[in-house]
Amino acid sequence: MKSRLRILSILLSLLVVQGCVIIGYRNHFSRDLTPEQQSKVVWNTPDERLLSLKNDGRIFAINGKQMQKMVQPHPKAIVYQWSPHCTSEACLSLSAIQTLCDNNGITLFVVADYFHDAFSQNQILTYPLFIANEKHYKTDVCHKLEKRFYIDLLGEETYNATKEISWYRYAYFEKGKFVRYIRDPYVELDNR
């Protein structure tokens, strides 16, 4: 009986590892983009300021310090870590979160987890869609890329103090300063 359990646990472990390999836990798959999609991705240099951007259908690969500069001039802002295929209640559609932010005087910045399906939904947003710059951070592994991006955005001390709840997906800022993560924007933001 023990050997059967051991074999079963090994098989289950292999399935999980196999799933990780298939899924890849790779972030953007930028190498898999079509030439047309590649032409719509702007790989900015780390020191480039993006304050005057409007949504023209392109996706901007940026780092956390650049996002921090973009958030600063706005009285209220949210950085939404958006995953195109997330089915959780915590993952609002781009149109829903943009409307909610517009109705509550909040500037919305969306950072996509990956490129897949991001191009088709980019038009909904006031600002262009962003993605963490895998070239700047020299990795396309999801958890490493997100960690480096959010350390740059929040600062290492704040990141470490909040990493237990960072999966909430919505980082809320006032006057350029990180205030908190938001779990449910409808409950915590809707002032109607």
Regions from the PLM with identified roles:
Residues 109-149:
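Conserved segment of the thioredoxin-like fold in thiol-based oxidoreductases
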Residues 68-96, 109:
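Short active-site neighborhood of thiol/selenol oxidoreductases, capturing the structured segment around
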Residues 24-70:
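N-terminal "domain-start" segment that seeds a small globular fold
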Residues 16-19:
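C-terminal motif of bacterial Sec signal peptides marking the signal peptidase cleavage site
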Residues 141-192:
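Thiol/disulfide oxidoreductase modules built on the thioredoxin-like
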Residues 1-8:
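Bacterial N-terminal signal peptides that target proteins for export
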Residues 88-90, 118-120, 180-181:
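Extracytoplasmic/secreted cell-surface and envelope-processing proteins
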Residues 96-103:
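Catalytic-core regions built around general acid/base machinery
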